[in-house]
Amino acid sequence: MSIEVDWRAATSGPDGEALAERIRSFIHDKFQQVALPRFIRSVQVHSFDFGTIPPDLEVKDICEPFADFYEEDEDDETSDVSEELVSGHGTQWHRDLNEPPFHEEMAMNRPLRDPFDEAFHSSTLRSPMEHLNPHFLPRAGTPGIPGGTSTLGYHLMSLGGLSGTQTPLAAVAGGTPFANGWTDPGMGASSRGHPSISGPTAVHPSRMEADIDTSNPTSRPSTSSTLPSHPSASNQPSGDATTGKEHGSLAEDEHLDDPMTSGHPLRLPPRMRERRPEDFQVLCHAKYAGDVRLSLTAEILLDYPMPSFVGLPLKLNVTGITFDGVAVIAYIRKRVHFCFLSAEDADALIGSDQQEARGQDDRPWSSADPTASPKRQGGLLREIRVESEIGRKEDGKQVLKNVGKVERFVLAQVRRIFEEEMVFPSFWTFLI
């Protein structure tokens, strides 16, 4: 089934101009990241135009979208707040994140933080004092407790260069009042690890100090790591706070000693959007021999009589391309994903032109004839027509013409950018 495209309506107007400018800016940025050869100083992309000749589209298949189109982009946070994310268990996945078994299983993978944990607090240096736990850090000034009424005192003292038993690490090992309040709440230990600590316990840290037997090495918290205690300590009653700390420290040391944990941290599977019945994908055989235009300039360096003696501007005008490939257009909710398939993927999904012709003629294909190979030959961009000129025109004549080296380099980069950014698994997404 063939499709007739209103090319003028699709590429003109404010939307068409904005899309053309976006493509020009994208190609320009890619050229700034390319390692240029010695004889080229810079490459600038000035304009892009879709032309007036539309492509020929033939629908080959309508199917379900590829799974890659459902992956949640890490950078796309604001536009997906209202969308439902699933990861194997549907909507239950969000609620399971806050359950204690999830935290116990994730203890060995501490660098990954639960983004949906409501108990998480940012660093005290960045958040107002009202967000701090009033039981853990009382507002009233308590003489004798370093830091006063907030943990800001600890940060200032640590910057001042504490030494010996006054450092927070030594304070934790010795069971001093620092053991209860010096950890940054942003790490999640003070607010999530010990929610059962009551107000009197926090106001009188000497009771906590008395519960720790400093003569027994096994009862002292581990100093091999500054990571917070195991989250399972939150399930311990308030009377067994010391036992919970011991269990968390021992379990944490076991995880730190595990080579599988330290060397190869586990990663959560990518978050996936939920499939819906209205999602669909169209595979089209696209042929294009149009007059798309791309204007570039490259500055060539001349090394005579000395290195980089003078630079000459080379103007390149792409006046048309010939394209033959398979396009993928997927519609998912309010997004349209667009890309092309490589020659191998296209042959696997819809077959090649030789296979279709052989099926219509009912003639067997002979492997001895290399010209009848069913594989698609070459890249997606079959031909790029270009015009070039160097220097300024004098009396209507160009100073130099058709500098082959620069042309080949620029056109090779255009092909590379197209195949890396437009061929699956790379794709473009448009919000509609």
Swiss-Prot record:
Major localization listed first in the record, in broad terms: mitochondrion
Membrane topology: Peripheral membrane protein
GO terms for cellular component: endoplasmic reticulum membrane; ERMES complex
One annotated GO molecular function: lipid binding
Superkingdom of the organism of origin: Eukaryota
Biological process per Gene Ontology, one example term: mitochondrion-endoplasmic reticulum membrane tethering
Keyword Repeat in annotation: no
Positions of region (Disordered): 182-273, 354-377
Domain SMP-LTD: 1-432
Localisation per UniProt entry: Mitochondrion outer membrane; Endoplasmic reticulum membrane
Keywords, ordered alphabetically: Endoplasmic reticulum, Lipid transport, Lipid-binding, Membrane, Mitochondrion, Mitochondrion outer membrane, Transport
PANTHER family reported in the protein's UniProt record: MITOCHONDRIAL DISTRIBUTION AND MORPHOLOGY PROTEIN 12
Subunit structure: Component of the ER-mitochondria encounter structure (ERMES) or MDM complex, composed of mmm1, mdm10, mdm12 and mdm34. A mmm1 homodimer associates with one molecule of mdm12 on each side in a pairwise head-to-tail manner, and the SMP-LTD domains of mmm1 and mdm12 generate a continuous hydrophobic tunnel for phospholipid trafficking.
Protein name stated in the entry: Mitochondrial distribution and morphology protein 12
Native source organism of the sequence: Aspergillus flavus (strain ATCC 200026 / FGSC A1120 / IAM 13836 / NRRL 3357 / JCM 12722 / SRRC 167)
Name of the encoding gene: mdm12
